[in-house]
């Protein structure tokens, strides 16, 4: 099942891009792009012109950031960020923000990878109105149960109360673990897109609750001081704050 009645359109690649060194980052980016193109009717989402492709310096290393943003009937913003720092570090960040008219959780995934290993790989569907819906708890359970196969599961940060009981957060050391993270990510993403295709608009009172929940999600994510510190070092504090509030975790209106 796909969103709307028209045939899905492929995503148009941005003119400027980065080439991740770690294969898991490339594989996950390709999965996100292809799945969005398969399930969703995509329209452009316009970022400020100076924030789509960004270059800076971080402790002598070149920092390059490329953002791709789209929207659809159900999602107000589909954001994929790819970044490289120097010759050895890759970062992937993705959030799928539903429109507040639809009672859906927020899909998010991040990878931080060096050439040797993935120090952090996370995927989740974060609830915005109470608990994660029963359909999601049940639908994600078979894939979530496999997270015990990771050798090193990680603890969530103190501000991570926004994440769900189905959150997978691990270090990825071996090719087998990389395949496992891809399989879990694919299952989560496809399940979410299938649920989105069936989503119907909610009443005004429920929409207000969803809007408040999405704002809380963004406010909690904005507390990630590590992201702010890296961006401030590469650019400056004012730029970092604008980028976080405009590109990464903008509050829905």
Swiss-Prot record:
InterPro entries: Ferredoxin-dep_bilin_Rdtase, Ferredoxin_bilin_OxRdtase. It comes from Gloeobacter violaceus (strain ATCC 29082 / PCC 7421). Catalyzes the four-electron reduction of biliverdin IX-alpha (2-electron reduction at both the A and D rings); the reaction proceeds via an isolatable 2-electron intermediate, 181,182-dihydrobiliverdin. It comes from the Bacteria. Pfam families: Fe_bilin_red. Its EC number is 1.3.7.5. Belongs to the HY2 family. The gene is pcyA. Keywords: Oxidoreductase. One of its GO terms (molecular function) is phycocyanobilin:ferredoxin oxidoreductase activity. This is Phycocyanobilin:ferredoxin oxidoreductase. It catalyses: (2R,3Z)-phycocyanobilin + 4 oxidized [2Fe-2S]-[ferredoxin] = biliverdin IXalpha + 4 reduced [2Fe-2S]-[ferredoxin] + 4 H(+). GO terms for biological process: phytochromobilin biosynthetic process. The keyword Oxidoreductase applies. NCBIfam families: PRK02816.1 (NF002760).
